[in-house]
Amino acid sequence: MTLCSSLWLNAQNFIHPGMLHTQADLDRTKAKVEAGEEPWASAYRKLLTSPHVSLDWKAAPVEKIVRGGRTIWEPDPDNYQLAYRDAATAYQCALVWHISGDKAYADKSVQILNAWAKTCKKVSGDTNACLAYGLYGYQFANAAELMRDYPGWDATDFGRFKEWMLKVWYHGVIGFLQGRNGTQDDHYWSNWGLCNVLCAMSIGILCDDVFIYNQATEYYKYMEDHRYGESLHHLVWKLHPDERGPFGYFGQMQESNRDQGHAAMALALAADLCGTGRNQGDDFYALKDDRIVCGFEYVNAYNSGVDDLPNSPYTNCDGTFMRMGDGGRGTNRPAQARIVNYYENIRGIEVPYSRKMLEMNENGIDAGGGFGGGNSGGYDHLGFSTLMCTLDPLEDKTKVPTVLSGKIAYEGREIDRPDVNCIPKGATVTLTALLPDGETDTGKWAWDDDPACTFSTRDIVLDTSRTFRVHYTNEKGVSNTQLFALHVEGEGWTGNFTPYYKMNGTTGTDTLIYVKKYDELTFGMEYIDTLSLIHISEPT
């Protein structure tokens, strides 16, 4: 084994833009639209008919977003529609700017984002507020990610927006993921966790915070010991051998026996989650032997008319759901082109049921907010996957990327994953990119930050939190990327924590305290929850 060691050159962090879309996606779409190629040209014309692509749109920010109002937890009525409409407008205007170059749409997007960051202080409601955190948080973050390099967005305003995402949104989503409102692990259906993971992950990217990114993706990748619905192992909770499915399996999804409206929502959120990860070099699609595509095809097979699918009763803490839920059958959420183009045009894997669902859209073109009705379901996803995710067909199905994985080692510990939080500052860390069993190593490795390193394994001295990416080119000349996301202990956003002590009847916030022998002392941290204005005290 050959190692290359370095501190590193040209430190970098997350790819920007790098959530639902990369710069390559934006450049490709712009070129295809300008050339009049289909389906991009028609998909763009559809975008332009959206009620949200309007320079006359007036932002309607509120100090308090309410979802689950008129309850004992929140007396005021719901107003969350204002958030999802403005988020959709900011996102769609950002797309139009990138494709057309018309700065008026960029200014409109920035105007909306600034208005919300300056005005909104909290999210409130009953437990349904947790859906607002996840859904509208990831949507605002994605709109901002598309606008972050716009010269017309003042750096101070962008900084304020990022702080808003951290203070108003991050604590809400991570609070839900960690606490589940005091319920059992499997009480919440997968959509609740998926949208909150997607939001936290997006905030980590937007704010270049490795800790938050890793903290979020942990729930999707590794939480097998819990029965969280968003964890991949439980999201696609059972594999049924069936030659019609990808790799010879259909994957029964956690929401399949509930109803198809929610199963389709989970499919689209998972697709956006996978797409976001892959855009950072973190290929969520390929995890656990491409388990997620077995779920995609299962949901899409049933919703495209297949009746004889294998199915098992699903049991959670609230009961047993004996058979496929047929409510909302035929629901089609705007993410099918993302699924089809990754699997068919990158990986060379046929997904006939996902393609059929894509083609069931008018002219095979999906849309987004403003096209699926005025209620919240029509705004659960930013959409426009046909426009933004369509690729040229893969002519040679053998020219596909090699699936990579990674592991790290430091201070005598070896961890079979490429993303770790709380590594000691200054530790020497060994990064190793791994090929699948039986794959011949071409030796064609390239690290983004250190062109001199051309091996699959390297040592780095980790002085600050950051990401590393290695690219591998296989025998077919096709490249793939593996992300390593490493967080240094003590770094990252600290939130609204204040240290305190109590001694001899006095309370203070100093961290250097002089005490006498046998004095009674209580010290700890106080967390001010800006979402509900609750004070949580954690004495030690």
Task: Label each PLM-derived region with a short phrase.
Residues N480-V488:
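C-terminal edge beta-strand
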Residues S456-F468:
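Solvent-exposed segments in extracellular or luminal domains encompassing
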Residues G426-P436, E520-Y527:
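A short beta-strand segment in extracellular, disulfide-stabilized domains
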Residues A11-N181, L194, L198, K221, ...:
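Extracellular glycan-targeting catalytic surfaces
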Residues M1-Q12:
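Bacterial Sec-dependent N-terminal signal peptides
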Residues L531-T540:
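Residue-level detector of conserved catalytic or cofactor/ligand-binding positions
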Residues D437-W445, L533:
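Solvent-exposed loop segments of extracellular immunoglobulin-like
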